[in-house]
Regions:
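Hydrophobic alpha-helical membrane segments
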Residues: 48, 64-82
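Canonical alpha-helical transmembrane segments
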Residues: 42-57
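Individual transmembrane alpha-helices with interfacial aromatic-anchor signatures
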Residues: 92-106
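Cytoplasmic-side transmembrane-helix entry/capping segments in multi-pass membrane proteins
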Residues: 8-9, 36, 60-68
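N-terminal signal-anchor transmembrane alpha-helix
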Residues: 1-40
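Membrane-water interface at the C-terminal end of transmembrane alpha helices
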Residues: 104-125
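Membrane-helix interface "capping/anchor" motifs
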Residues: 2-6, 53-62
């Protein structure tokens, strides 16, 4: 068992599950989506991206690209939420965009997990 792969896999899967936790729920109900969970998803996604930087393979390049997409979309979602929220309220349009951006990041994270599992299954024991 390779400890580096275990740690990287842990953060890749944790990034996806935190992102799903933020994304899931009624897109019109702000109470269903925690800004702290969005912040945690951003931090864990950035950690997962940094852990992927050491992989010099073609698969590593695709994994880094998918992580960068997720990072960019989550940071954009948090930026929108921060800029447009006033007195703990946010317009439904901006909130819908925030949820949509996190959904795009979730797709990038799912892609990353599928590729990571595929790469693990193809590697020699």
């Amino acid at each position: 068992m390779n400890l580096d792969k275990v740690i990287a896999g842990f953060f890749i899967i944790l990034a996806m599950t935190l992102n799903f936790g933020f994304f899931y729920g009624d897109s019109q109900d702000i109470i269903m989506h925690s800004k702290y969970e969005l912040f945690a998803a951003i931090i864990v996604n950035i950690i997962a991206t940094v852990l992927k930087l050491g992989d010099k393979t073609q698969m590593g390049s695709v994994l880094i690209a998918s992580s960068l997409v997720a990072d960019l979309q989550l940071i954009a979602a948090a930026t929108l939420w921060t800029i447009y929220s006033t007195n703990n309220t946010i317009s439904p349009e901006i909130f819908a965009i925030t949820i949509s951006l996190s959904g795009g990041a979730l797709l990038a994270n799912i892609t990353s997990v599928i590729l990571y599992i595929g790469d693990t299954l193809q590697s020699k024991r």
